[in-house]
């Protein structure tokens, strides 16, 4: 669990990281490479005294192909995924953003709505006393309800946040217990 001061600092870090990534998005344009976009994101985070301990970027077709897309020379044309784990004062927050030039595809809209549903189910289930295994099952059931049964097997579903990118990760046998004062 985190102290009240740590929770306040974590919230501030989350807000500042989101703003920095937003500024990076304003500064990039189609045609740039994933590497150039990653550099811009790291630059904006550094301006806010944050370090990106994880920087992932995928453009267009690479989004569907890689769960942890290390930036390449691939150039952005329409759709972009940006991911960071931003660190300041020892604490780490994780965030992802999708950017589209023009109207997003119907498929992307559907996947975004489904991901939001899964996230809402997890937020609702993340209460003191819940186990990581219960949260994993909640996510698996929510994916299935949205027509994405088995999607949970393609990537970890996250877990408690704090001084590591994940203090623990939810999985089917996860015995970790959600405690008051933890961040997710």
Which residue ranges define each predicted feature?
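Active-site neighborhoods and metal-handling regions in enzymes and metal-associated proteins
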Residues: 1-184
């Amino acid at each position: 669990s985190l102290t009240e001061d740590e929770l306040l600092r974590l919230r501030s870090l989350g807000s500042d990281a989101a703003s920095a990534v937003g500024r990076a998005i304003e500064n990039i344009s189609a045609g740039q490479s994933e590497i150039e976009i990653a550099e811009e994101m790291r630059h904006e985070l550094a301006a806010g005294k944050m370090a990106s301990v994880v920087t992932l970027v995928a453009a267009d077709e690479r989004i569907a192909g890689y769960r942890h897309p290390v930036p390449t020379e691939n150039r952005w044309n329409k759709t972009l995924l940006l991911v960071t784990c931003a660190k300041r004062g020892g604490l780490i927050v994780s965030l992802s953003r999708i950017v589209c030039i023009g109207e997003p595809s119907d498929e992307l809209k559907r996947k975004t709505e489904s991901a939001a549903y899964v996230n809402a189910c997890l937020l609702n289930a993340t209460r003191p006393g819940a186990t990581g295994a219960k949260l994993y099952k909640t996510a698996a059931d929510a994916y299935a309800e949205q027509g994405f049964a088995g999607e949970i097997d393609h990537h970890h579903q996250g877990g408690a946040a704090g001084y590591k990118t994940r203090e623990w990760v939810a999985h089917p046998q996860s015995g970790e217990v959600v405690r008051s004062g933890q961040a997710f």
